[in-house]
Amino acid sequence: MMTAKIKWLESQKIVGESGTGHSVVMDSIDSNKGVGPMEMILLGVGGCTSIDVLSILKKSKQDVIDFEVRVKAEREEEHPRVFQEVNIHYIIKGRKISESHVERAIELSTEKYCGASITLSRSGTKMKYTHEIVNIE
């Protein structure tokens, strides 16, 4: 079972602590004294799929030198302002990176392993995935 504890600090500023003891400060977007809760969801999705894709590429002997994921989301205008669409863009830099290995790693992450992105997808959020490979000599 996963657990989390949220503690109020001041105004709308809170600190969340994971069951593993890691903390993050959150706040409303208006106050901007911490990460917003909806931003946390995007960070979670980006982090989840990043860990998967990097692990899969390493297992397939891809020489990754740098890796970045950029996540953008569109939300509904009216409350509860849920995500309508989330776009995840992977940027992989390395030596002789295989297009097919990258595509397979992203597919495995987004369809089998990354519970965060699969949860959003199953809840009705439209998920889009793109990537670019920068091969360095």
Regions found by a protein language model. Give the residues of each.
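Extended beta-strand/beta-hairpin segments
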Residues: 1-43, 54-137
